[in-house]
A protein has these predicted regions:
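Vicinal oxygen chelate
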Residues: 1-16, 26-27, 33-124, 131-158
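Short acidic-aromatic low-complexity motifs
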Residues: 19-23
Length: 158
């Protein structure tokens, strides 16, 4: 008997997404982010109540929105309170791949002040994904200076 408090392959924090049309979402995540599918479990109504995909070394659980279970997707609630962040070898290629798969731009790619080549896309299911490649490691002092400069520009009157 295992003494581990978490299943093999899981991390301490494992995201779980609620989507409308889990089959289409799994296909999108495969095309956009290179996800591989793990398990898939359907409920009595045939909708996916639990599925697992893997993007890189990270496991993500997902299931269909279902008001009876109290699970609502961002499409049902008309909003999304968070996002997922993926570090990739080439942010430009990953961004392009996601757009070709059907994602939309939320934040264009740029060389961000924190040292990443970074942009954000929204998937067709309402979830947002940050795509990044680390291009420069910064000290805490360099990070603070860069953040202060960025915020001064962002809040300056037009």
């Amino acid at each position: 008997m295992s003494s581990s408090k978490q299943p093999a392959g899981y991390h301490t924090v494992t995201p779980a997404l609620v989507v409308r049309d889990a089959n289409a979402a799994i296909d999108f995540y495969r095309r956009a982010f290179g996800a591989s599918e793990g398990s898939r479990m359907a409920g009595p109504d045939g909708k996916i109540m639990h599925a697992e995909i893997r993007i890189g070394d990270s496991l993500i659980m997902l299931g269909e929105e279902n008001e009876q279970w109290g699970t609502k997707s961002p499409l049902l609630t008309n909003g999304n309170p968070g996002s997922l962040h993926i570090y990739v070898d080439d942010a430009d290629a990953a961004f392009d791949r996601a757009l070709k798969a059907g994602a939309t731009v939320k934040y264009p790619l740029e060389d961000a002040f924190w040292g990443d080549r970074y942009g954000k896309v929204a998937d067709p299911f309402g979830h947002e994904w940050g795509l990044a490649t680390r291009v420069k490691d910064l000290t805490d002092a360099e990070m603070k200076k860069a953040a202060d400069e960025w915020m001064a520009k962002a809040t300056a009157p037009a």
